Amino acid sequence: MRSTELVQWFRQSTPYVNMHRGKTFVIMLDGDTIASENFINIISDIRLLHSLGIKLIIVFGARFQINDLLMKNHIRPVYHKNIRVTDLRTLELVKQAAGQLNYDIMSRLSMRLPHSPLLNVVSSNFILAQPIGVDDGVDYMLSGKLRRIEVENIKQQLENDAIVLIGPVAPSVTGESFNLPFEEVATQVAIKLKAEKLIGFSNTQGILDKDGVSIPDLLPQQAANYLQQFIERDQYHSSQARFLQAAIDVCRAGVHRSHLLSYEEDGSLLQELFTRDGVGTQLSMESSEDIRIATARDIPSLLELIHPLEQQGILVKRSREQLEMDIEKYTIIDRDGVIIACAALNVYEDEKMAEMACVAVHPDYRSSSRGDVLLAEIRKRAKNLDIEKLFVLTTRTVHWFQERGFHMANVEDLPKDKRDHYNYQRRSKILIQNLTEPSE
């Protein structure tokens, strides 16, 4: 990377650094990821995330290493309903594999680099297990499920600037040890800790479509369809399938976003988190929500949504007739038939510019990521129209747009028609984002 590109990357990443600081991320590291040649670089990137003020919980699995030990000991893995059946001998090998990985991960995270502080990595009894029991006549023996998560203990460690490390073996209240599916642990930890993100890795750059191209965004129902395809191909144990199941569950429980990245590509974690378009697959939003182009039937709901903001002077007043004429310009988020957010895209073809206008989010959802979802969709629509610059006029949300890569501009920077009709009495701030800039 040339020095100018490096400077540009740092500048573009700044909004994301600010956005992620203080948030809690749960990172899933399965056995394949840990065994990959690129794992040492992933560890370095995790250390970087911690240095940027992100609270990190690492949940690791050991399926690859466990199966390797079983094979070396001439023991055939046994599964029932995609869950490993763990007898006493198998549990000893599970503990051996998990214990070694726990030590290796902790050692690599704790490795001190020149002029950098020593990281505090904590691995303790943060979870308690209980036996799965018998299902359809099959005794799972020492395979377990979560009984309790020590949420306050984990929070305290995060507040003390520690990285929390959790493995797939946990004790029970009776003193026995149980083998847990690590994706179940990661799922429940993310939900109970109210994490901002769940991050996983696989041998592909996210979920691929039928042409082998990475899918940038998925809704839960779309993710469920892809998960079913993995199951039908008898690939439930793949990294992709296990991540999809976890991501669907956490998204429906309130975790804002989940990301699946390649463990083979160096820097994929940083590219996903600190560039505009990312590199892997992101799953977000609840299944009850739909983002779509507005229709005439949506006009009453749109008026109801934007009217309070017009009364406050935040939005310019729009008549019903004007909405009817421009309805196809509006992108809306529909939640169970209720419009909870909207934004319009006004295109100026000659200048290859477009305006994101009439941005409104229902008060009950303003603390969520709906604004980000709208912005991403408007960007996508603009790019599909070969728009090079996206601009906004705002009186109240300058910082919000600046945090997402927009830069202050002047009236002279607007398209001619918009410039000629600029309301100097309203004194709206003008912000512009270049859609043609590289994302790294």
From Swiss-Prot:
Highest taxon of source: Bacteria
Reactions the enzyme catalyzes: L-glutamate + acetyl-CoA = N-acetyl-L-glutamate + CoA + H(+)
N-acetyltransferase domain mapped to chain residues: 289-429
CDD domains: AAK_NAGS-ABP, NAT_SF
Single Gene Ontology BP annotation: L-arginine biosynthetic process
Pathway per the UniProt entry: Amino-acid biosynthesis; L-arginine biosynthesis; N(2)-acetyl-L-ornithine from L-glutamate: step 1/4
Keywords: Acyltransferase, Amino-acid biosynthesis, Arginine biosynthesis, Cytoplasm, Transferase
Subcellular localization(s) per the UniProt record: Cytoplasm
Stored SUPFAM superfamilies: Acyl-CoA N-acyltransferases (Nat) (SSF55729), Carbamate kinase-like (SSF53633)
GO cellular component, one term: cytoplasm
A Pfam family the protein falls into: Acetyltransf_1
GO molecular function, one term: L-glutamate N-acetyltransferase activity
Primary residence: cytoplasm
EC numbers, comma separated: 2.3.1.1
Family: Belongs to the acetyltransferase family. ArgA subfamily.
Miscellaneous remark of the record: In bacteria which possess the bifunctional enzyme ornithine acetyltransferase/N-acetylglutamate synthase (ArgJ), ArgA fulfills an anaplerotic role.
Name of the protein described by the UniProt record: Amino-acid acetyltransferase
Origin organism lineage: Bacteria, Pseudomonadati, Pseudomonadota, Gammaproteobacteria, Pasteurellales
